[in-house]
């Protein structure tokens, strides 16, 4: 019997091996189908792909669904095309339209993407726009291209209702009337990792953040500290990068424009079924637009106004750049990023006058401006076990901030008489400046788990997360000089310097260590098939450098009603906070001192939103009614930074999108109203420097039926009047002794941008013109209204190598 069994095994083994050898792998089936499709054997390709094993990797399934959709498109089988386009977007919600994708296929992707798109920011888990617990603005790569966007600020102010650009030493934003001197109330993330400074909370949404590597941007409008903690006061912006396998080669571009503007980008991507690599590099330089200002102009400031010039939007004497890498291997992901940005300040501080930028010496490789260089690395592990998903990460952030600030070419002013703001030798000299340097290192880790559950007819999921951050500020210094290059004073760490005429008041720069422990949870529960409860809270415990302990609770509760697939209604409440920055709590500047025990700012937000779609017209309408109450705003009261301000705002945000066969139109409109305020940059009716009415319209026309691969785009932005109150340091002449007395009205205005994009084989040609009609206008947000660039242009050549 044993001999017969052995003989049977020996005979069957070759047959089994032969059977295995003739069974093609999933990769071989896909390659065969691609070859058949390329030579027009569509039916054979379909037959091969219909037998594709569904257990293969998602990255391969994506290509299978794409190829099936293309095959059925060639057969004009609309039902099958729509089916596989939907499956493709389900596997890869971030699918990027390729150069060789047919126009009809690209239109179907665009028409279905917004409705089928998956979000990860709203709940830190995959979900649709319909089920997001708060109002979300989704900005795709095509939408970024449709406005010829150059900076993240331009993208956000165009597509996100309630966001308005502001001026200052760095690019700034207001959200629903809330802003500070730098952008530190909106949390900006790159693939979920914080980009805001850990010492100042600030991040400038300008050229230091490349857009070439971005696949989509998810914007949570409203308080979001329940998941993201500190800084997520008014909104969260998550930048989702492209995937290497979609880039599939090298992309390079070179741009040139007026005002000695140059920009270069490199993007490389490659991927297979268990690994993916994406690398990017972006470099930007611009002299900025130079305005020659006569001494009689309203833009000439100073105790004794003189003729001079200012540079607006200058980025030079170090250029601005963004370098990064994403590498995925199975369940592991590594992200590395290094960025630098330095913007030229139009005016000096202190007496707010024009200055000769080129006369000031280079210090640490920089001329005057606020420079930030930051580097971070994140190692992440993610896996799914049955109904539980686990995600763990470890990150390290290093930052070097250098503020090279000009006080004035000539400092003669009432300051000389009062002798209160500067040492004696400063008041009677020229070319006065100071340089502050901060270095800080932050490391930490985060782990979270998502558990799905089923309770009878009800289902949902539960999210639990823990986070730890360790912040260390070190090697901080302050230097002050005169005659454009001479360093007369240096203070490091906790050294002190006695200011003449100031009694015992001292200047110091503080080092220190701070720790933050966080725990957060969220539940998404389907009460009924059409009614969802989404709630959560976060607890943050912070130990400050002086051992003061901070405890913050951030709750959120949302009800989402989905009567059908075309309409939804959401009601939500959330509370958020932003802690007073480390630099504000430790950095004393002669006449301005931090109040002991400076506390976080808080925001309570109520929102009622609704979304409606009419698919035959590819029309989508979104409306959101909001009410916000901001408390503990940090303001300057009697030379002290203190928590004295509050602000109540309400408003209506609306957006509308049309998608026609060859025309895409998007518009948004915001009306916001100040209810009341205390000790804020506002009067009884207006928040200073922010309009009550904002409107944007964007249109992109595909001319492929007439001129293949040619697209035209246009944008019109309209803003109502604004009011501006001059800062404490502004002078308009020797008789102007009452600081901050002037309230000026800045008229309403509209700006028009146009552009075109043409593709030819592996090349793209793009031309964009901003402020087409060369309109003169000013933006507030700083101590004075600042002139903005007139008509500007930028031409781009881009090529791809696969």
Predicted regions and their residues:
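Extracytoplasmic beta-strand/coil segments of soluble accessory domains associated
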Residues: 153-193
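Short acidic/polar hinge/loop motifs at secondary-structure boundaries
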Residues: 165, 193-221
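A beta-strand signature from Gram-negative outer-membrane beta-barrel systems
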Residues: 208-253
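Short strand-turn segments of transmembrane beta-barrel domains in outer membranes
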Residues: 236, 241-271, 276-281
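Periplasmic-side early beta-strands and strand-to-turn transitions of outer-membrane beta-barrels
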Residues: 246, 271-362
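Face-selective signature of the C-terminal outer-membrane beta-barrel domain
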Residues: 326-342, 370-547, 622, 666
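Membrane-embedded beta-barrel scaffold of Gram-negative outer-membrane proteins
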Residues: 389-395, 401, 562, 570, ...
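Gram-negative outer-membrane beta-barrel transporters
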Residues: 526-532, 618, 624-629, 642-727, ...
